[in-house]
Swiss-Prot record:
InterPro entries: ATPase_NBD, Carb_kinase_FGGY, Carb_kinase_FGGY_CS, FGGY_C, FGGY_Carb_Kinase, FGGY_N, Fuculokinase. GO terms for cellular component: cytosol. Coiled coil: none annotated. Pathway: Carbohydrate degradation; L-fucose degradation; L-lactaldehyde and glycerone phosphate from L-fucose: step 2/3. Pfam families: FGGY_C (PF02782), FGGY_N (PF00370). This is L-fuculokinase. Its cofactor is a divalent metal cation. One of its GO terms (biological process) is D-arabinose catabolic process. The lineage of its organism: Bacteria, Pseudomonadati, Pseudomonadota, Gammaproteobacteria, Enterobacterales. SUPFAM superfamilies: Actin-like ATPase domain. Optimum pH is 7.8.
Amino acid sequence: MKQEVILVLDCGATNVRAIAVNRQGKIVARASTPNASDIAMENNTWHQWSLDAILQRFADCCRQINSELTECHIRGIAVTTFGVDGALVDKQGNLLYPIISWKCPRTAAVMDNIERLISAQRLQAISGVGAFSFNTLYKLVWLKENHPQLLERAHAWLFISSLINHRLTGEFTTDITMAGTSQMLDIQQRDFSPQILQATGIPRRLFPRLVEAGEQIGTLQNSAAAMLGLPVGIPVISAGHDTQFALFGAGAEQNEPVLSSGTWEILMVRSAQVDTSLLSQYAGSTCELDSQAGLYNPGMQWLASGVLEWVRKLFWTAETPWQMLIEEARLIAPGADGVKMQCDLLSCQNAGWQGVTLNTTRGHFYRAALEGLTAQLQRNLQMLEKIGHFKASELLLVGGGSRNTLWNQIKANMLDIPVKVLDDAETTVAGAALFGWYGVGEFNSPEEARAQIHYQYRYFYPQTEPEFIEEV
């Protein structure tokens, strides 16, 4: 009997992947190929995506795992992508203008001048989404101001996940989790905001029916099936924005904050309430819609391992193994003998170290950076608790930064709550697959699907006495 799987097509900024996941959340087959944006013809500093190239990359991935897939019964397909990007299309779904990439600087001026249409504070209070130059709203305002005839001609605006879903099924839809990144939703109503659309002159008719995660969009059509080398008629289930599925796929429960630790740290939570009026008071804050109706994902982000990489280059070399830095910092007592670091290297004039003496070593500088970043996390978690009306009892940690066991322990000590680390990197794919299984009727809810997965976490508990932490 063939093994049943959900096939997740994941379009990331650096890689496009096809991954087959079984009912227990185990990966049965996977393939990956690099993804890259193109330089726009109009201006060599502008970036855009080629939809045809992305679809070809998916086809290449599916063909790489074709022999494994022929041994499987593919119950459903789910598509995940990065947020915000999309394109205007005609009635056949043909692009009227290329997909402007989130990396493209052309929309920065629109963001800077948005106050002439609607106040930035009001915008965030309604939509939840922070002021980021790549937001969908700014792309549409840019198109309206520079190519007004395209907005008039357009049948629809499709987010990138919906562009892919349209090519698979022929259906025009809007993934709710993608719309949640757009800065055009009334986040409390889970629908496009008449106030924002009216102020910016964007017609509501451009946005096709909203689909919730786990809802069936349609089935795989002949041309797409031939391109991917898959059987015709496979149900295509709505997923959408990768962040929301990473939260669910990591096992995050309601009111359990999740920290994705990498070059940037992104702190988010799945909360039943959110005070969007507070968001604009905190730089780097945002709020998106959760994968499940009735929940929100408020969050904030800041530069983290990017600071540590700079410290490494400054005192060691860019190639020095991290373990060497960690071992030197372990020898320093908590508090780094009074050396403190203000870690906001991007926007604070007072960034850097204080309390340096003739006895200060490079280990002190690195430990102070770890402690300074953790103090930043502590402040941001307190803000998030206020915004999301919850109290954290533990922190779920994912991403490359979670491999630093000393930093994990410092986090547990300073936050005074357990830190649990999930090593599995495929949280987005896992989350999308769980909604896929729910969508094809295998389970009564995404939670029931998730209950089949055995999560393995490593725990770091607060330590009252300073001690050297053994490698876990």
